[in-house]
Curated annotation (Swiss-Prot):
Keywords: Amino-acid biosynthesis, Cytoplasm, One-carbon metabolism, Pyridoxal phosphate, Transferase. It comes from Methanococcus aeolicus (strain ATCC BAA-1280 / DSM 17508 / OCM 812 / Nankai-3). NCBIfam families: PRK00011.1 (NF000586). Its main location: cytoplasm. InterPro entries: PyrdxlP-dep_Trfase, PyrdxlP-dep_Trfase_major, PyrdxlP-dep_Trfase_small, Ser_HO-MeTrfase, Ser_HO-MeTrfase-like, SHMT-like_dom. The record marks 225 as: Plays an important role in substrate specificity. The gene is glyA. Homodimer. The modification N6-(pyridoxal phosphate)lysine is found at residue 226. Pathway: Amino-acid biosynthesis; glycine biosynthesis; glycine from L-serine: step 1/1. Its cofactor is pyridoxal 5'-phosphate. This is Serine hydroxymethyltransferase.
Length: 429
C-alpha cells in the first residue's frame, strides 16, 4: 500500500468497525463501551505527553494539568471503592496484577489462584505475570457443580501449603469468591489476600457483587474497561500502609508512562459510575439472570440453574452437554459471529487447559447490552436469536437480518451524563 493511502485506509476501516458494531449484539464479557465525553477526553493533548512518577512529584516538567486529572481519578477511585489508597497508573489489569506480585512476593514464593479452566486468568499462572515474577502457582480446590471454590478444602490447602499470596477473582466469574473464609487461615500462615476484580469492578462499584476490601483482601486490582465502563487501563486499590510499597512497584517497577489520555477519559467514567453505577450494576445482573433463564428454557445447558445461573454479568453455557445442539462451542462461536452475535468460546472446569482452541463452553456477558439500554425483555429476544441458530438450524443470513434490525434500535449510551450515539465516529478533519 502506498504510504499516502494509509490514512484513508485506516479511516475507512475504522468506519467499517463502527458500522459493524452498530449492527451486532455484543456479548463478550470482557468488553464495554464508553460514553462520548469519555472518548472526547481521550482525543486530547494528553495522548502526546509523559508524566513519570506520582502527581505533584513528577520527573518531567509540564504536568500541571495531568496532575489535576490523575488526582481526580485517585479521589474518585478511593471514594467509589471505599479504599484508603488507589493507584490508577497500571496500563492494564495484567500490569496491575504484576505490580501486586512484585510488591508482595519474591521469586520462588507460592501463589494460590484459580486454575484457568475453573475461571482463573492466565496472568495468575506461569505463562504470564505470575511466571514473570517467578511465583509457583497452585490451584484453589474447585467445586464444578457450584462453579466456585471449595471452602473447606481451600482452608486446608492454605494451612498446608503456606502460600505467600492467596488470590481470588478470575475471568470466568459467575459468583462471589469466599474471601472471608480465607482470612483466618491466611493470617495464620502469613499470607496476603489479593483480589483480581477485573471482570466485576463495575458490579462492586455499584454495590451488587461482593466487597473484597471489607471482606479481608489487602489488595483489589483490575482493569477499568469491563463492567467498569471506563478507558482501557488498570487500577490497584489497597490500604494506606501498602501505599508506598505498591506505588514504587508500579513506577518505576512495571510502568513508565501510563497513557495519560486514558486517565482523562477514566475520570469521566468514574464520575459516571459514582452517579449511575448502582442502577447500572443492578440491571447488568438482572439481565444476566434473565438471559440465563431464557436460554435454559429454550434447551441450552446453562450452568448453575440451581443457583439462578449467575450473580454477575456472566452466563456460562456448556455446549457439549446441550443435547439439542449439534455443534461444538468453536463452531457455534463462528456461526454466531456470522449472524452478528459476538461472543467467545471458553474453557470449562472439565476441559484440558491445552484445549483452549476447542473448549466445551461459551461465555456471555450482559454489561455492554445493558449500557445500550437493554433490559430483561431484550435478553429474551437475544436468547431466541441464539436458539434459531444453535438449535433450530435456521438460515444464518435470515437470522442476521433480524439481528441487524434489533441491534440498530439500541445504539444510544445509557447511564451517563451525556449519552449520544454509541457508534458515532469522531471525525477531526
Amino acid at each position: 500500500m502506498n504510504p499516502s493511502e494509509v490514512q484513508q485506509f485506516v479511516r475507512e476501516t475504522a468506519l467499517k468497525q463502527h458500522n459493524w458494531m452498530r449492527e451486532c449484539i455484543k456479548l463478550i464479557a470482557s468488553e464495554n463501551i464508553t460514553s462520548i465525553p469519555v472518548r472526547e477526553a481521550c482525543a486530547t493533548d494528553f495522548m502526546h505527553r509523559y508524566a513519570e512518577g506520582l502527581p505533584n512529584n513528577r520527573l518531567y516538567q509540564g504536568c500541571e494539568y495531568i496532575d489535576d486529572i490523575e488526582n481526580l481519578c485517585i479521589e474518585l477511585s478511593e471514594d467509589i471503592f471505599k479504599a484508603e489508597h488507589a493507584n490508577v497508573q497500571p496500563t492494564s489489569g495484567v500490569v496491575a496484577n504484576l505490580a501486586v506480585f512484585f510488591a508482595e512476593a519474591k521469586p520462588g514464593d507460592k501463589l494460590m489462584a484459580m486454575d484457568v479452566p475453573n475461571g482463573g486468568h492466565i496472568s495468575h499462572w506461569k505463562v504470564s505475570a505470575a511466571g514473570i515474577r517467578g511465583l509457583r502457582a497452585s490451584a484453589h480446590p474447585f467445586d464444578a457443580e457450584e462453579m466456585n471454590i471449595d471452602v473447606d478444602k481451600m482452608v486446608k490447602q492454605i494451612l498446608e501449603e503456606k502460600p505467600r499470596l492467596v488470590l481470588f477473582g478470575g475471568s470466568l466469574f459467575p459468583f462471589p469468591h469466599p474471601v472471608k473464609d480465607a482470612v483466618d487461615a491466611a493470617n495464620e500462615v502469613g499470607a496476603t489476600i489479593a483480589y483480581d476484580g477485573a471482570h466485576v469492578l463495575g458490579l462492586i462499584a455499584g454495590g451488587q457483587f461482593q466487597d473484597p476490601l471489607r471482606e479481608g483482601a489487602e489488595y483489589m486490582m483490575g482493569s477499568t474497561h469491563k463492567t467498569l465502563f471506563g478507558t482501557q487501563g488498570g487500577v490497584v486499590l489497597t490500604e494506606k500502609k501498602n501505599a508506598k510499597k505498591i506505588d514504587d512497584k508500579i513506577f518505576p517497577g512495571v510502568v513508565s508512562n501510563h497513557h495519560l489520555h486514558h486517565k482523562a477519559g477514566l475520570a469521566i467514567a468514574l464520575a459516571e459510575t459514582k452517579e449511575f453505577g448502582e442502577a447500572y450494576a443492578k440491571q447488568v445482573v438482572k439481565n444476566a439472570k434473565a438471559l440465563g433463564q431464557a436460554l435454559y428454557e429454550r434447551g441450552c445447558n446453562v450452568l448453575c440453574e440451581h443457583k439462578g445461573f449467575t450473580e454477575s454479568h456472566q452466563v456460562i453455557l456448556d455446549i457439549e452437554k446441550s443435547e439439542c445442539i449439534e455443534f461444538s462451542a468453536r463452531e457455534l462461536a463462528t456461526m454466531f459471529e456470522e449472524a452478528n452475535i459476538i461472543l467467545n468460546k471458553n474453557l470449562l472446569p472439565w476441559d484440558d487447559v491445552s484445549n483452549s482452541d476447542n473448549p466445551s463452553g461459551i461465555r456471555l456477558g450482559s454489561q455492554e447490552c445493558t449500557r445500550l439500554g437493554m433490559k430483561e425483555s431484550e435478553m429474551d429476544e437475544i436468547a431466541e436469536f441464539m436458539k434459531r441458530i444453535a438449535i433450530d438450524g435456521e438460515d444464518i443470513k435470515k437470522v442476521k437480518e433480524d439481528i441487524v434490525e434489533f441491534a440498530k434500535s439500541y445504539s444510544e449510551i445509557h447511564y451517563a451524563f451525556e449519552g449520544g450515539d454509541a457508534f458515532k465516529y469522531l471525525k477531526f478533519y
